[in-house]
């Protein structure tokens, strides 16, 4: 499998310009559209390339997926128990407390306030991640990615809860 950054002609950095990513993606989709193929073999190749472009785009446009993918490129597997245990017991306890808070909150307005707080935390964590990758501090990038994953989980839970409260 080709490196997603290379496939889309992008520099392998965390803090990518999403407008350039989108521009590159659409340009490549046009170039390798299966309907533009001259024969069956080329059409099959273009289908594979188009599929890889879709995977690359969906991975790189999402801050969490991009971080996980970059760590994977550096040989860090977040599913490894040693890697997952890098978050402190206190951080995990806070996460579970926040999950419980969401579960027990029934006011839509309160949920919106919690959501705003986590959206700010998400932005901050993405900025910290960009710095960690820039310094190639994989240990810190791993911890920041784990935190970002927990924030995404909380935001997802909030979205579900907010739908029920409407």
Swiss-Prot record:
It comes from the Bacteria. Keywords: Chaperone. InterPro entries: DnaJ_domain, HscB, HscB_C_sf, HscB_oligo_C, J_dom_sf. Gene3D superfamilies: DnaJ domain, HscB, C-terminal domain. GO terms for biological process: [2Fe-2S] cluster assembly; protein complex oligomerization; protein folding. GO terms for molecular function: ATPase activator activity; protein-folding chaperone binding. Residues 3-73 form the J domain. Belongs to the HscB family. Co-chaperone involved in the maturation of iron-sulfur cluster-containing proteins. Seems to help targeting proteins to be folded toward HscA. Interacts with HscA and stimulates its ATPase activity. This is Co-chaperone protein HscB homolog. It comes from Rickettsia bellii (strain OSU 85-389). The lineage of its organism: Bacteria, Pseudomonadati, Pseudomonadota, Alphaproteobacteria, Rickettsiales.
């Amino acid at each position: 499998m080709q490196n997603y950054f290379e496939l889309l002609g992008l520099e392998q950095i965390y803090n990518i310009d999403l407008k350039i990513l989108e521009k590159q993606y659409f340009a490549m989709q046009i170039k390798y559209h299966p309907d533009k193929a001259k024969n069956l073999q080329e059409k099959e190749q273009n289908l594979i390339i188009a599929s890889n472009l879709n995977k690359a785009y969906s991975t790189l446009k999402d801050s969490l997926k991009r971080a996980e993918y970059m760590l994977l490129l550096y040989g860090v597997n977040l599913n490894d128990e040693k890697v997952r245990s890098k978050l402190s017991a206190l951080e995990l306890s806070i996460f579970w407390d926040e999950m419980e808070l969401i579960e027990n909150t029934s006011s839509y307005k309160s949920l919106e306030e919690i959501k705003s707080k986590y959206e700010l935390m998400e932005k901050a964590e993405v900025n910290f991640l960009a710095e960690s990758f820039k310094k190639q501090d994989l240990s810190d990038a791993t911890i920041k990615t784990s935190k970002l994953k927990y924030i995404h989980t909380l935001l997802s839970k909030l979205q579900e809860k907010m739908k029920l409260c409407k």
